[in-house]
Amino acid sequence: MAHKKAGGSTRNGRDSESKRLGVKRFGGESVLAGNIIVRQRGTKFHAGVNVGIGRDHTLFALSDGKVKFEVKGPNNRKFISIEA
């Protein structure tokens, strides 16, 4: 004879792996060409001078230099540039 009532099942208990998004190199930091600066979904940050954009909207350095964050334009967009 069972001494515990049968437990029900649940349909919860899953979660997706984190995607490690965000800023990888901050303002004033030195970078080498090819270094990833930001991993993002969509263009939260836009590519400025000497910054390339990947097909998943990742921003990366096109040349060696220092990272510079700036807000400009009528819509106050955030741009990331590399200063040599």
From Swiss-Prot:
One matching Pfam family: Ribosomal_L27
GO cellular component annotations of the record: cytosolic large ribosomal subunit
Gene3D superfamilies with a match to the protein in the record: 2.40.50.100
Signal peptide span: none
Gene Ontology BP, a term: translation
Family the entry assigns: Belongs to the bacterial ribosomal protein bL27 family.
Protein name, entry field: Large ribosomal subunit protein bL27
Species of provenance: Shewanella denitrificans (strain OS217 / ATCC BAA-1090 / DSM 15013)
